[in-house]
Amino acid sequence: MDATLAFPLLVGLIAVALFFDFLNGLHDAANSIATIVSTRVLRPQYAVFWAAFFNFIAFLFFGLHVAETLGTGIIDPGIVTPQVIFAALMGAITWNIVTWVFGIPSSSSHALIGGLVGAGLAKTGFSSIVWQGLLKTAGAIVMSPGIGFVLALLLVLIVSWLFVRQTPFAVDSTFRVLQFVSASLYSLGHGGNDAQKTMGIIAVLLFSQGYLGSEFYVPFWVVITCQAAIALGTLFGGWRIVHTMGSKITKLNPMQGFCAETGGAITLFAATWLGIPVSTTHTITGAIIGVGAARRVSAVRWGLAGNIVVAWVITMPAAALISALCYFAADLVA
């Protein structure tokens, strides 16, 4: 392919992608620290530094399978143009900002995938969609909250049985320490899965402009800059969403926080190794609901959980609609 986009414009579009990655950290990093903050194991200002560090080093632990899926497995890379990438990013960024302002824990992953699909449909219609990859991703998006729910619920039941003879103080003290481990694992999972989505976007843009040759791959500088952007976003993560995730859905103690984070982390690790982009937001939401339901069903604020599900359902079509409109606008200007 010929490199048809002026270099300054290419740099500008990459900057937009990195801004999305920063917003992803800002918006979704709350998921990494919500439970450890709500259980008062760490203060918010210390928790964000903790999460940012593990978000940044996540590339050391995972392959780049999620980036490859985003780059080649959602829409046909052959139809990708700068307008498609711009529209996809603007759809995702716009929706992320709207939900962040209102403190709604919607998914940056859903928004980006919806943005890609909307831009692809606007350009060439249904032929632009890689249906096998999209359906696999959509299936994982639907299943991941349920998997997080089940794993966290099982962990609570197992841990409660193992520590049944311990005093509440001893259990609390033990899991205050163990929550550092579980929060670290969840932050690794978040950085490993979410940063790779932006890597895939930047890499397919470079590929479409001929900068990668005939083979799609993710350059190392893209890996580092994306991990840095999501880590910086984590440092500025929003307390609005931390409060919703960590205390409004259900009250948590350190043992429950450990189980929620561990259940969510296992889900994210498996998805990342399989190359499936999933929602870190809804994975931890499912896990938090699971630990609340293990205590008693009424411990979960089901009304708020229902609002989160509504946001989960409308995110992809909303981002797709915004991105399609942005594509048509960008195409007119071009």
Swiss-Prot record:
Keyword tags: Cell membrane, Membrane, Phosphate transport, Symport, Transmembrane, Transmembrane helix, Transport
Protein name: Probable low-affinity inorganic phosphate transporter
Record field: catalytic activity: phosphate(in) + H(+)(in) = phosphate(out) + H(+)(out)
Lineage of origin: Bacteria, Pseudomonadati, Pseudomonadota, Alphaproteobacteria, Hyphomicrobiales
Entry's family note: Belongs to the inorganic phosphate transporter (PiT) (TC 2.A.20) family. Pit subfamily.
Example of a GO biological process term: phosphate ion transmembrane transport
Source taxon at top rank: Bacteria
Listed transmembrane segments: 3-23, 47-67, 84-104, 111-131, 139-159, 216-236, 258-278, 308-328
Taxonomic source organism: Rhizobium meliloti (strain 1021)
Cell compartment(s), UniProt: Cell membrane
Broad class of the protein's primary localization: membrane
